[in-house]
């Protein structure tokens, strides 16, 4: 979650409140630990140079990340929009091996191309 085309309203008076993103857990065929990084990009981006990223909860080991509304405001600002900003998010999955490509790391890798609208409330 969130679902496609969800709108998150960012209350600038409550920037410490949180919003949770979660996804299906990946498994490494090598038995090595999996780490996750959530990445955000503009709707026309390809995630090669995301506008914002953060390791998931528990130092990257959980299949979820808890972001504050302040962090969502950073993403909103990085999107360079005013009014409602549309962004998409994805999850980068790694197992620590530089020789393993994404498709080989996990047998249940979920790529999220979710469009999310962020709106600032004053």
Q: Which positions does each model-derived feature cover?
A:
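Beta-strand-rich modules
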Residues: 76-103
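An aromatic-rich alpha-helical recognition segment common to small helix-rich domains
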Residues: 23, 38, 89-91
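Short, surface-exposed loop and linker segments with low hydrophobicity and enrichment for Pro/Ser/Thr
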Residues: 24-33, 77-84
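Glycan-association/targeting regions that enable binding to alpha-glucans and other polysaccharides
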Residues: 71-83, 113-122
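Aromatic sugar-binding surface patches on proteins
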Residues: 59-77
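Pro/Thr/Ser/Gly-rich low-complexity, intrinsically disordered linker/stalk tracts
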Residues: 1-30, 98-122
């Amino acid at each position: 979650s969130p679902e496609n085309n969800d709108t998150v309203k960012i209350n600038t008076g409550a920037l410490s409140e949180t919003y949770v993103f979660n996804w299906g857990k990946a498994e490494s065929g090598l038995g090595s630990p999996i780490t996750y990084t959530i990445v955000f990009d503009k709707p026309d981006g390809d995630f090669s140079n995301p506008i914002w990223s953060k390791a998931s909860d528990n130092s990257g080991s959980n299949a979820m990340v808890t972001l504050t509304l302040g962090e969502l405001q950073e993403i909103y600002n990085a999107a360079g929009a005013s009014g409602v900003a549309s962004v998409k998010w994805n999850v980068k999955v790694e197992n620590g091996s530089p020789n393993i490509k994404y498709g080989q790391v996990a047998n249940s890798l979920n790529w999220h191309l979710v469009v999310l609208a962020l709106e600032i409330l004053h």
